[in-house]
A protein has these predicted regions:
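Surface "functional belts" at beta-alpha junctions
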Residues: 98
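Carbohydrate-associated surface elements
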Residues: 102
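Short, glycine- and charge-enriched coil/turn segments that flank and shape catalytic ligand pockets
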Residues: 27-28, 70, 116-119, 146-151
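Gly/Ser/Thr-rich active-site cleft segment
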Residues: 12-14, 121-229
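N-terminal glycine/serine-rich phosphate-binding loop of ATP-dependent small-molecule kinases
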Residues: 1-95, 123, 206, 223-229
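Hinge/lid segment of periplasmic solute-binding proteins
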Residues: 106-117
Length: 229
């Protein structure tokens, strides 16, 4: 392997995030934290949101600081699971992603199981049943904000949404898809049985890619804004 390789990890937790450079000098791997920031939810009109635009701002700061450390060969993003953003047909974010601690999913398990047997859902996905799962968040939208789902062209989970902001590429990484309770664990694709039985829009789910897949490059706009090739 080539010596002096540097890569950037953007690691997001539910309360904080950080940018870390991983370096390989031909013999050993070393890590250096170059940026750390808080991840604070925002409550607006009784809904709890993620401040995703602020998080993206901190990604940009991390990229600028990484540039000062030398050439970065690649970057990757990881976040918590289940939460997502919806894009319209023009690729614009319809609203800030809602926080998994928001109360909108209360009672949604019962509505799902009225349409699809609980054992069937578990046999397909293998997921633990939690009200915060993407499945129940989508049911909450279908029940209470159907107009939002009607406007949606694409659903992107949090790491994929941030990747999209950087690259304009839309896809869903497999391991984060596994947190949704919508993934067919056997076939490693979206469960058409669950999606169809719950009358969810099929078109919003993007192609699934495996961990480590190169999905693209920084968009021209981001490259020019930050001065990064």
């Amino acid at each position: 392997m080539k010596k002096d390789v540097k890569v950037l990890a953007l690691d997001f937790g539910a309360s904080s995030g950080r940018a870390i450079i991983g370096s390989f000098d031909g013999e050993k791997i070393s890590l250096k934290e170059i940026h750390r920031f808080t991840n604070d939810p925002v409550i607006l009109l009784d809904t709890m949101y993620w401040d995703v635009l602020r998080l993206f701002h901190d990604i940009k700061i991390g990229l600028i600081k990484a540039k000062q450390e030398g050439e970065i060969k690649s970057l990757g993003i990881d976040t918590w699971g289940v939460d997502f953003g919806l894009l319209n047909k023009d690729g614009k974010l319809l609203e800030n992603p809602v926080h998994y601690r928001d109360a909108r999913t209360k009672g949604m398990m019962e509505k799902v199981f009225a349409k699809l047997d609980k054992d069937t859902v578990y046999s397909i996905t293998g997921n633990q049943f939690m009200e915060l799962n993407t499945l129940f968040q989508l049911m909450a939208l279908k029940e209470n904000q159907p107009e939002l789902l009607q406007k949606a062209e694409t659903l992107l989970l949090m790491p994929d949404l941030l990747n999209y902001f950087l690259s304009n590429e839309k896809c869903t990484e497999y391991t984060i898809a596994s947190t949704t309770q919508l993934l067919d664990a056997k076939n490693k694709t979206w469960s058409s049985e669950i999606i169809e039985n719950l009358d969810l829009p099929k078109n919003i789910f993007t192609k699934i890619v495996q961990p480590g897949t190169k999905i693209g490059k920084l968009s021209k706009q981001i490259s020019e804004e930050l001065g990064i090739n």
